Amino acid sequence: LKPTAPYRSETRRQRYDKRATLAKTIPVSICAVNFGLDENLAMTIRSAVCYGAESVMIIGSKPPDSFLRPRSGTTISYINILQFSTPHDFLEHCRDRDINIVSAELCDEAVDLNDFEFDFDKKTVIVTGNEWVGVPAEIIHNSQPIYLPYCGKGYSLNTAVTSSIILSEFNRQYAIHNRITT
């Protein structure tokens, strides 16, 4: 899909509507765990839409669409949002549907994203945690934890940035997988 010219006569909504007819969906979702900054959820939604994710799952509170719409570049209208009250409810949803759970977390069991191979035999959800406390232990113990390697001075990335990087890697591996299997 080629980007459009910088000077447009159509509204953003018209451009998105047109692009939606050509867009593809890949078998991945993002789960945001009780984000402390609502803007991070909006940016995560935008990345999920751009990469073709099936849905954004939210554990905890969800700000009103009127808040998310302008901050997500209006992309909230183009993705399915699922909301869960607790990590247990989320895990039950994934178990019932046989969804792979991959969590972005800095923990001893985590695998370097560069060494991780996504399983495309079933759908995947990528969990990114709260900005201050991370992914709940209940989810970590029922998922494959991964981490993003970096050599700079920072210790961790913003949760919306993390989800975008992992979505990009999922998208890359999925494209290679489809070339090999088709």
Where do the model's predicted regions map?
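Post-transcriptional modification and biogenesis factors for structured RNAs
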Residues: 1-182
